[in-house]
Regions:
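N-terminal intrinsically disordered, cationic/polar leader segments
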Residues: 1-70
């Protein structure tokens, strides 16, 4: 059941590993894709792998990209 909104507000690398979204910033966080309702990328300094984009699409998880002005 998805319930998390993942918000990326600063420099980070987003990737995929074993059905998890991996967020590498100052430290590393992993969130299982089944828990994610939406990914909101508010930073223009974020990097996201194409494989993660593909997996989010397969799981029907929307990705929203915006800048500081929204």
């Amino acid at each position: 059941m998805s319930w998390r909104t993942v918000i990326i507000e600063s420099k980070a690398k987003l990737s995929y590993k074993n059905d998890h979204l991996v967020i590498r910033a100052e430290d590393v966080h992993m969130v299982h894709l089944s828990e994610i309702a939406v990914v909101l990328v508010e930073s223009t300094a974020a990097v996201i792998t194409s494989y993660l984009i593909s997996e989010l699409s397969n799981w029907k998880i929307p990705i929203i990209f915006c800048d500081t002005k929204h």
